Amino acid sequence: MECRLSDYNFEFPKELIASRTAGKGKTHILYCPKNGGERRIMKAPEIVDLFRPGDCLVVNNTKVIPARLYGETQFGGQVEVLLVQALNPSESGEARFEAKVHPGKAFQVGRELKIAGVRTFVEEVHEEDGNRVLRFEKTPAEMEEVMNKEGHVPLPPYIDRPDDEDDKKAYQTIFAKYAGAVAAPTASLHFSEQMLEDLKAKGVYVAEVTLHVGPGTFQNISVEDFSQHKMHGEHYELTKENADIINKAKRDGGRVVTVGTTSTRVVETIADANGFLKPQRGVTYAFFYPGYKYKLVDGLLTNFHWPKSSLILLVSAFYGRENTLEAYKMAVENKLKLFSYGDGMLIL
C-alpha cells in the first residue's frame, strides 16, 4: 500500500470552520453505515437509536486545563507559553512544566521572565521539538490557582479568534474529570447529559479512558510518505473497572464504539491480539493509518478532521480512504461544520 499524504487532502470553504459550537446535543452527525448502506445526516440526539442494548461507548474523561499564559521578559517584551505537561517539582517544591513558547529567543536557558505575574526560570531547551522546561516560583497547587485565574483556553490554531468566557464551558466535555489536556477530546462535545441518560436507559454501557491530549494533536505531517512520520506521545490510563466493562461488552457480543480518536488510541494501544484489555497506564506513540487492522473497535464517533492530518489517517484506517473522503465530500456539500467545534460522523 502506498502511503502518500497528498491522497488524504480535501477542499472546503473556510466558512465551514466552526468558530463556536452549536452546543452539547445540538450538533449534526453524519451516520455512515460501516458495511455499506446510505449515509444520512442526523441530529445528535437521534444517534441514540443506532445503539443496541449491550453495546459499549468508550469516552475520554480528560479535562482541558487553561494552559495558555501570557507574560513578559525582563525588558518588557511580550511572550506566550502553552503548558504541555506538569513535571516533577523542584527540590524546593516549585512547580515545573514542559511548555511550548513564543518567541523562542526570549526563552534561553537561565533566563528569568514573568509569566502571569509569576517569576519564571528557563531550565532546559529540548532540541527535538523546541519545548522548554520552565520553573515557576509557586508550588504546583498555587500554580493551579494562577492558571484558573489567569490562564486562557488553548483553542486550536484554526479557530481565528481569542478565547472568551464561553469557551471555558463549551470546550469542556460532560465527561471531563482529570485535568491534563491542552485540547479537548472534541467528539465527546456532541453529548448532552440527556443523551447519556438515554443511552444508559437503553442498556448501553459507558466506559471511560483517560488520555491527556497534547498540542501534538495539531502537528502537521511534514513528509509525503506518512509511514515515516514520527507520532507525538500522549499519557493515558485505563483502570481495571473500565477494562472490565469493555471486556464484558465484547465477550457478550456487544459493539465497542469509541468516542473520538483519543479513546480509539488508548484501547487500540492496549488491546491484545483477541481485542481484550488489561488495566494499564503509560505513554502511547501509536500511529494508525490505512493498512492497520483494528483489534477491538467496532464503531467510531469522531469529528471532521484537518486535511492530511494523522487524525484523518486514523479514520481512513477504520473506514477506508475512499469511504472517508466521500463522507467528507457529503459533509461539505451539506454545509456541516468542520473540526473541533463542528459536527461529527458516526461509523457504525
Regions found by a protein language model. Name each.
Residues 1-348:
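A cross-family signal for N-terminal binding/gating loops and helix N-caps
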